[in-house]
Amino acid sequence: MAGLALRLVLAATLLGLAGSLDWKAASSLNPIEKCMEDHDYEQLLKVVTLGLNRTSKPQKVVVVGAGVAGLVAAKMLSDAGHKVTILEADNRIGGRIFTFRDEKTGWIGELGAMRMPSSHRILHKLCRTLGLNLTQFTQYDENTWTEVHNVKLRNYVVEKMPEKLGYNLNNRERGHSPEDIYQMALNKAFKDLKALGCKKAMNKFNKHTLLEYLLEEGNLSRPAVQLLGDVMSEEGFFYLSFAEALRAHACLSDRLRYSRIVGGWDLLPRALLSSLSGALLLNAPVVSITQGRNDVRVHIATSLHSEKTLTADVVLLTASGPALQRITFSPPLTRKRQEALRALHYVAASKVFLSFRRPFWHEEHIEGGHSNTDRPSRLIFYPARGEGSLLLASYTWSDAAAPFAGLSTDQTLRLVLQDVAALHGPVVFRLWDGRGVVKRWAEDPHSQGGFVVQPPLYGREAEDYDWSAPFGRIYFAGEHTALPHGWVETAVKSGLRAAVRINNNYGYGEVDPQMMEHAYAEANYLDQYPEGERPEEQQAREEVSPDEQEPSHKHLLVETSPEGQQHAFVEAIPELQGHVFVETVPQEKGHAHQNIYPSEHVQVHGEVIPEWHGHGGSGTPQMHRVGDHS
């Protein structure tokens, strides 16, 4: 049995490597890949490798958002000599990188990002630079299952004869793998690129849904399209832009090779934080931003009726699109930028983990990869051998996540358990230990969605908005500001671009000088009044520069101890939940991150802090046991 397992692991590894080599060979000739290339990719790779030039004009930079885009930009700017302060509305860092760690077993589950394709060289280089170890993420295992229409087959059968699943494929489609059938439809896209050129072709693709293109342009039969939706999870993209589907497929295919971070993806944001100097303020939601002649002021909610103000030279906003819409800008954003912000289309994404007493899938010779089902769970990902028995029992996005909307955690876990048992038999019920974790990104108060996927641009200009251009002293970064959407490297690229522009003193654009003057005068309105005689609505606003921040009575202060560089909790007042303030000692660059996260633990569907100012923390999830409503 051990010899068989070893052969299966070796076969899966060779298959993944062969798929990667096939993809690399194809990508050098693939016009779609060439069309979607980043013109500045090699430059950004150099920035990750060598860093930015040391600045001769250090600026005070406030970075809003401690996801990977914000942390990467903060690291690069800090290394270049700028004074950086990071503000995060949540009670943790990482954004949509979110690793669950089961205290009982030590197993981990990725509630957010979990893989990176081999083509993402910038992200691979960043991980190596930070000393993070990578290992293979097994995307495909031929011994996994596909179950649709109550027919269940091993995936090595589906690859050769998908019609055995009950799809009435035509003669051209029979005997071809789902991936090959999808490639048949892309042949028309290749012809369009050659005939129209990259820009015109992508404009055309932006005006079609994936479903329209597959049926009308790709000339696939309806059963073949349904096969792709069920087996390749393309159904979630059917009514979205064909251009977006092309970008997604370039990074998401069973024929590509993927990596993951050994020990958990949250080691990436932790390593970034440890490598930069400056301050991090958690539980610090930004409510408004005011630009003046010579500075920009960032207003943070400290309670329901009071604010604190930070003054900086430049602000970098890396929060999600919905979070940005809750910020008041003075002067207001341009109409075009507001329209681009409202046009961002976030799709839901949900993950459900179940904890088992042992990895029963090994008995079926499954060492990783994913099974597919047309039941609500849709995709089931298996941990690699030696990675425990915490099963990603459901991964859904876009419309496929709808069956779980509104369900309680208990209902969700039981529904997913039934789906897993349909694939693997009653042993699933016997081995489940009654615990699980649910993460619905659409219900997260800070992201309010899984990732951006744009719908077709019917009757509108099909070109993507250029988020890299600053709005006065305000810059933007994040997964929504770059392509392809939905990947960690995209967020990294956006953070690098913003850091380069800020370091090069790119300049300030898009702001009407008269509006800037008006905003500056309004921001300084308080100065007309002696202390204690200010207008009531301004009473609670307090101004402080990043250099002079002091913890208020509502803050949880985290300081670096001189001896061990470990964070020591000071002034924690449980009944007054406020900011968590993390700062490094000027002489000693870097953070010790063991205690960055608050000590509160909650179920994913619970809350870490009361809903003051309309914000609920996404929390540090705890394993939920069915029937436990405490």
From Swiss-Prot:
Reaction(s) catalysed (UniProt annotation): an L-alpha-amino acid + O2 + H2O = a 2-oxocarboxylate + H2O2 + NH4(+); L-tryptophan + O2 + H2O = indole-3-pyruvate + H2O2 + NH4(+); L-phenylalanine + O2 + H2O = 3-phenylpyruvate + H2O2 + NH4(+); L-tyrosine + O2 + H2O = 3-(4-hydroxyphenyl)pyruvate + H2O2 + NH4(+)
Keywords tagged on the record: Adaptive immunity, Cytoplasmic vesicle, Disulfide bond, FAD, Flavoprotein, Glycoprotein, Immunity, Lysosome, Oxidoreductase, Secreted, Signal
Positions of FAD binding: 68-69, 88-89, 96, 112-115, 286, 479, 486-491
Residue ranges, annotated region (Disordered): 532-554
Residues annotated as glycosylated: N53, N133, N219
GO biological process: adaptive immune response; aromatic amino acid metabolic process; L-phenylalanine catabolic process; L-tryptophan catabolic process; L-tryptophan catabolic process to indole-3-acetate; negative regulation of T cell activation; negative regulation of T cell mediated immune response to tumor cell; negative regulation of T cell proliferation
UniProt EC number: 1.4.3.2, 1.4.3.25
Signal peptide positions (record): 1-21
Pathway where it operates: Amino-acid degradation; L-tryptophan degradation via pyruvate pathway
InterPro entries: Amino_oxidase, FAD/NAD-bd_sf, Flavin_amine_oxidase, Flavin_monoamine_oxidase
Gene disruption phenotype: Mice display an accelerated B-cell egress from the bone marrow, resulting in the accumulation of peripheral follicular B-cells.
Superkingdom in the source lineage: Eukaryota
Protein family: Belongs to the flavin monoamine oxidase family. FIG1 subfamily.
Protein name per its UniProtKB record: L-amino-acid oxidase
Organism placement in taxonomy: Eukaryota, Metazoa, Chordata, Craniata, Vertebrata
Gene that this polypeptide is encoded by: Il4i1
